From Swiss-Prot:
InterPro entries: B30.2/SPRY, B30.2/SPRY_sf, Butyrophylin_SPRY, ConA-like_dom_sf, PRY, SPRY/PRY_TRIM38, SPRY_dom, TRIM/RBCC. A zinc finger (B box-type) spans 90-131. Its main location: cytoplasm. The lineage of its organism: Eukaryota, Metazoa, Chordata, Craniata, Vertebrata. Its EC number is 2.3.2.27, 2.3.2.-. This is E3 ubiquitin-protein ligase TRIM38. Transmembrane segments: none annotated. The gene is Trim38.
Length: 471
């Protein structure tokens, strides 16, 4: 009864005294009374021509006003909109069969009932309750479900970010492998070019297949994320509405929300499977290289005093030796770093030699100008007469140049290395005989002096130069 009385009072406040209906676009005049904008304008236009007055009296209190002083009453307009919304909700919450207001709820069927539905046989034996009694319980259920959906949404958002990271990481890994494959083929003979295209084609297909999987996972997660957002908006609307609105079809709503389970992300390892195993392809190239193979013997007159040469000058080992001052004074001998040169000198043509490094963890090898500096401040770079590569446990395999270069990639640690020199072409190249792959070629040089094989030996890392007839 009190609620009905309040509604009457609110309607009276929000009604226009001219048209007697709820105000539309309410405006206030000087005295503070409010009217429909169209009503007060019509009133002014009807009365003013008859009297000739620019100022007219308020229809309620006769206080003077003019159209110039009309002010939109936003607060009243907001109240009117709220009343209309409440009335619309109340209209929706009426039993279509009996045209009575819903005020009961059937727990078994999950349906709203009017007082006439309440007494029907179809609900006999069911758990029936007043709307007010079950409202709070179901509101809490909806809110709990909304919390779970938000957690699901947050989880999927994290997974979307993870998938995006996976895509970028996958692209980087593929690009890294692509560069490795390209470098393997860079300086090989022209007949290998078609094979290079084939391997890159396989890699592209592998990349596309994995990206399709990753992007598909990303799209599925995005769809789930958006569905969760829609469910959250629906639940928010229910929780903000009336009790009847909240309970209407509530079990179906909860069932749909519960059906959205969190799917664990399957994070497969991002491993590029395409490998360029050029062992068979490289067989013909090795045959060509070995046409130019020479048997290298180490020159004892150049060996640092801490190096021991054995097996006919083919094995060199780092070993602390007694100092021979006369031997140390030799201009040919390295006295700074533990290095040694091969006996052979190259002034023209092509040469290829192999070095066994299977028992060594660190080494420097290649070719150098015969008269390079032998002291401590030796810079192993082309500008100083060195064309060498270096292996170390800390930095891996790298080319020794005046400017830093990225580490050289190897499929596996080489047991035997091949060094190829084309004097006229100004080329020095390195190959892994173990895997049959190209490692590195220095930029073209212009050789003028005699070149010789160069080796720097480290502790516990002996180097061996196999004879040609033993390979």
């Amino acid at each position: 009864m009190g609620s009905d009385f309040s509604t009457v009072k609110i309607r009276k406040v929000t009604s226009c005294s001219i048209c007697k209906a709820m105000m539309s676009h309410p405006v206030s005049i000087n005295c503070g009374h409010s009217y429909c904008k169209s009503c007060i304008q019509s009133y002014y236009c009807n009365v003013s021509p008859k009297t000739g007055w620019k100022m007219l009296g308020c229809p309620l209190c006769s206080s003077p006003f003019s159209l110039e002083n009309l002010r939109p009453n936003k607060e009243l307009e907001t109240i009117i909109d709220m009343i209309k919304g409440m009335e619309e909700q109340d209209q929706d919450m009426v039993c279509e069969e009996h045209e009575e207001k819903f005020n009961r709820f059937c727990e078994d069927d999950g349906q709203l009932l009017c007082w006439r539905c309440y007494w029907e046989d179809r609900h006999k034996g069911h758990t029936l309750a007043h709307v007010k009694d079950v409202y709070q319980n179901y509101k809490e259920k909806l809110q709990n479900t909304m919390t779970k959906l938000r957690e699901l949404q947050e989880n999927h958002e994290v997974q979307i970010h993870f998938i995006t990271h996976q895509i970028n990481a996958w692209k980087d890994a593929v690009e890294d492998r692509r560069q490795t494959i390209k470098s393997n083929f860079k300086n090989l003979q022209s007949f290998l070019q078609e094979e290079e295209k084939f391997y890159l084609w396989r890699l592209e297909n592998e990349e596309k297949e994995m990206l399709v999987q990753l992007e598909g996972s990303e799209a599925n997660l995005q769809q789930t994320f958006e569905r969760a957002q829609c469910q959250i908006q629906e639940l928010e609307a229910k929780c903000q509405g009336s009790a009847q609105k909240l309970l209407q079809d509530v079990k179906n709503t909860l069932s749909r929300c519960e059906a959205m389970k969190r799917n664990p992300l399957k994070a497969d390892p991002l491993k590029v499977h395409t490998k360029c195993n050029v062992s068979e392809l490289y067989f013909d190239v090795k045959t060509i290289l070995r046409r130019h193979q020479v048997s290298v013997i180490l020159d004892p007159s150049t060996a640092h005093l801490d190096l021991a040469l054995t097996k006919g000058g083919r094995l060199v080992t780092y070993k602390r030796c007694p100092r021979d001052l006369q031997a140390r004074s030799s201009a040919k001998r390295f006295y700074g770093l533990p290095c040694v040169l091969g006996c052979e000198g190259f002034t023209s043509g092509r040469y290829y030699f192999e070095v066994s490094v299977e028992n060594a963890t660190s080494w420097d090898l290649g070719v150098c100008v015969e008269n390079v500096h032998r002291g401590f401040n030796m810079k192993k770079e082309p500008e100083s007469g060195f064309w060498t590569i270096k292996m170390s446990e800390e930095d891996g395999l790298e080319a020794l140049t005046s400017t830093p270069t990225p580490p050289l990639h190897l499929i596996e640690k080489p047991q035997i290395l091949g060094v190829f020199l084309d004097y006229e072409a100004g080329a020095v190249s390195f190959y892994s005989v173990t895997t049959g792959s190209h490692i590195f070629t220095f930029p073209k040089a212009s050789f003028q002096d005699t070149l010789r094989p160069f080796f720097q030996v480290y502790q516990y890392s002996p180097l061996f130069l196999p004879a040609i007839n033993n390979q």
